[in-house]
Amino acid sequence: MRTKSFRPLAALVAAVVSLFGGAAQAQEEEKVLNIYNWSDYIGEDVIARFEKETGIKVRYDLFDNNEIVHAKLVAGKTGYDIVVPSSNWAKLQIDGGLLQKLDKSKLPNLRNVDPAIQAQLAKMDPGNQFLVNWMWGFTTVGINVDKVRAALGGPLPDNVWDLVFKPEFISKLRSCGVSFLDSSSEIVPAVLHYLGRPAYSKNPGDYAAAASTLKSIRPFVTLFSSSGYINDMANGSICLAVGWSGDINIARQRAIDGKTGQNIQALIPKNGGLLFFDTMVIPADAQRPGNAHKFINFLLRPEIAAANTNKVFYPNPVPESRKHIRPDVANNPTVFLAPAELARMVAPDSLNNDMRRLMTRTFTSFKTGL
């Protein structure tokens, strides 16, 4: 009887030992971290510093649009431990159960993040449970100043979006090269905003208006690119790009460093560009979430955040990093926007899958010329 009475207790003890033993094993992750991030979006020695400090080997793959990232996450088994989607796409991924919640006890440097950035992310991620900002910026127009002025034969329009969405302007620029981002979620909201419609409209009729405008300018777009346009601007192969603010500044810096003679400038639209907040997330099936938390926490150190901004000309979410940022970057008005200009920017919004599909069809028709 006594032996029999102890069997349940023995089983319970074995279960507890197994549970805690399994937890200990889970914490002993392989010294590897797989990251999937945007191209041209990290400081030169940031990965090397993390690897040296932690002994974790980073495998770092690149993408150039949110559509690719989302498709991979939906398919599952990406093999990645950190992915960097924009916040409005991450909202879809949260809703779809594709991400795992952050363990904030492993992220003490979250205290360094600007509350205003956290508030922006909370619009997509209530309670800031899944997303941490990597960096942010805005979608705008970048130009080769000398070539554009020569092609126009006069001054720039007051509304810089006229350069790309009015045939009378863009038709004059075709000869020196016009590039658009190869992404429905960038170009369609931009033209909707230009037309005075909600950039992330839920009204199908607005997309018909966008399609009409895009069709009128299609003959004058010579390139669709979400990464290669940086070098194309720097070497003078194109004179205008609808692109991201930091990328256009990278092109400017490469032109300076390479002494190519190209005068590249990111423009700040008076009626606003499209803000984006790129976020670090951990896929639901990530194999090394502990290593992922270590990297996220590392990125939120002021000196590390500054190293990223100094290299790629995008603002980071850590205010204390400003003292580590080079003066030429800190004083660049297209990197750190003036409050009035920031107020005119359009904040990101989420769309359901039906509206996403309509946006994709609108862009595909534009790109193919159909």
Roles of regions detected by a PLM:
Residues 100-111, 131, 162, 258-274, ...:
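Short beta-strand->loop
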Residues 231, 339-370:
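Conserved C-terminal helix/tail region of periplasmic/extracytoplasmic solute-binding proteins
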Residues 27-93:
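Early extracytoplasmic/lumenal segment of secretory-pathway proteins
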Residues 84-90, 94-220, 225-234:
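Extracytoplasmic ligand-binding site segments that recognize negatively charged/polar headgroups
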Residues 207-216, 222, 260-281:
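Periplasmic-binding protein-like
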Residues 89-92, 240-261:
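A ligand-binding cleft/hinge motif common to bilobed small-molecule-binding domains
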Residues 283-344:
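Mature extracytoplasmic/periplasmic domains
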Residues 142-147, 193-196, 276-288, 307:
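A bilobed periplasmic-binding-protein/Venus flytrap-type ligand-binding module shared by bacterial periplasmic
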